[in-house]
Regions:
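Acidic, glycine-rich two-metal-ion catalytic cores of nucleic acid-processing enzymes
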Residues: 180-282
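Acidic, metal/cofactor-coordinating or nucleic-acid-engaging core segments within structured domains
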Residues: 177
Length: 326
């Protein structure tokens, strides 16, 4: 964390963990940006090839049999690239899950100050490397759906364009609009998949440390892009039986919606609840664990805890200067 040592005693342990997790989320954003860049390279390359094939063939003058053959070949190319993106993202996210599980274990223990949280055993990490499930469906199915939707609409543009007497150039323009939409959908899927795998790692750490936890707390990234549902849930807690604590909002694991940036923080019990003699512990650790949370953890407070250089890195220098000037 980037908080100074003199700031730490003012915060509870759970508050410090929240700040550290917010730091961690920035790394998630960078990772999903890397994944999106790689996916866009694959997708854009294939889409350029489709446009070149359409232009070279002059589809507005093709006999029906040749048109059917061309469309079949192009749809096969679309299916192939989406299968490749599925394999690539699944492999990447499998490695990300392992790394995230290990980093979260280290993060929580670093903030506690000693080896407090149990690590997720390697055999459980391997068992958890199953298909990423988003809104009830495997990532593979989401990619297949996007590929099928694109192929269906692509063929529809060509066939309807011919019925309407359009020139090849007009149909290519419509296909380009479809491609822009498909790229946005692919980006959204990558962002959401990274968030889901990160949550899965958090859940694995939780299940390994139920005896020291009081529950889970929803942490939203609070800025102008925060959804209403995430604003509502920010700061709310649930016990380990998923029952709301002092509210009536039902328990739900993130991502709550496409591009969701929320997380569920693990909230530790107090030393007293754990049956630990706090007098035998370092005073800084003892005080931070049992003190109340000093402030609401949100994006604004988190940014204020960063150095100007770190603020520039997160926001970009221009936006950071504007933010610092209010």
């Amino acid at each position: 964390m980037a908080l100074s040592s003199q700031d730490k005693p003012k915060q509870s342990l759970n508050s410090r963990i929240a700040y550290a997790l917010t730091d961690r989320k920035i790394l998630h954003f960078r990772y999903d940006a890397h994944l999106r860049q790689q996916v866009m390279k694959q997708l854009s390359k294939t889409q350029r090839e489709l446009l070149n094939r359409l232009a070279a063939a002059g589809v507005d003058a093709l006999p029906k049999k040749q048109l059917d053959t061309l469309l079949k070949e192009l749809k096969q190319e679309v299916a192939k690239v989406y299968q490749e993106m599925t394999a690539y993202t699944q492999d990447e996210l499998s490695g990300f899950f392992t790394a995230e599980t290990q980093h979260l274990h280290q993060l929580y223990n670093d903030e506690v100050g000693f080896d407090f949280f149990n690590q997720v055993p390697e055999y459980k990490q391997k068992a958890n490397k199953t298909a990423t499930i988003i809104a009830g469906s495997p990532l593979e199915d989401w990619w297949a759906k996007q590929g099928n939707d694109f192929a269906f609409k692509f063929e529809g543009i060509i066939r309807q364009g011919l019925l309407d007497g359009q020139q090849t150039s007009q149909m290519i323009t419509d296909v380009k609009h479809l491609m822009n939409t498909s790229r946005r959908h692919a980006e959204t899927l990558v962002i959401t998949a990274v968030a889901k795998v990160a949550d899965k790692a958090h859940q694995a750490l939780r299940d390994e440390n139920l005896d020291i936890l009081a529950g889970e707390k929803h942490l939203s990234t609070l800025d102008t892009r925060t959804s209403t549902v995430c604003q509502l849930r920010d700061g709310l807690m649930w016990d380990l039986d998923k029952k709301p604590i002092d509210h009536d909002v039902p328990y739900q694991r993130p991502p709550l919606h496409p591009r969701c940036r929320s997380i569920l923080q693990l909230v530790t019990k107090s030393w007293k609840e754990l049956g630990i003699d706090a007098e035998e512990m370092p005073s800084s650790t003892r005080a931070s664990q049992d003190s109340p949370v000093s402030e609401q953890i949100n994006y604004e407070n988190w940014l204020k805890s960063k150095s100007p250089e770190q603020q520039d890195q997160v926001l970009g220098k221009g936006k950071a200067d504007l933010w610092r000037r209010g």
